[in-house]
């Protein structure tokens, strides 16, 4: 058990969910052509 922070499995799941959310936002942007990520200056 780590002294500080999250467990290793929690960090792994969090990273995978973050990657999935970013890929999903790219997919939605290309489908809807709203350019939300460009507006937020991520791309």
Curated annotation (Swiss-Prot):
Which lineage is the organism of this entry classified under, starting from the top rank? Eukaryota, Rhodophyta, Bangiophyceae, Cyanidiales, Cyanidiaceae
> What is one cellular component GO term in this UniProt entry?
chloroplast
- Localization, UniProt: Plastid, Chloroplast
Cited SUPFAM superfamilies: Chlorophyll a-b binding protein
Gene name tied to this protein: ycf17
The answer to keyword Acetylation applying to this record is no
Keyword hit for Plastid: yes
Main role?
Answer: Possible role in chlorophyll and/or carotenoid binding.
One Pfam family from the UniProt entry?
Chloroa_b-bind
UniProtKB keywords: Chlorophyll, Chloroplast, Chromophore, Plastid
GO molecular-function terms, A-Z: chlorophyll binding
Tell me the protein's name. Answer: Uncharacterized protein Ycf17
Task: Please give the family membership noted in the entry.
Answer: Belongs to the ELIP/psbS family.
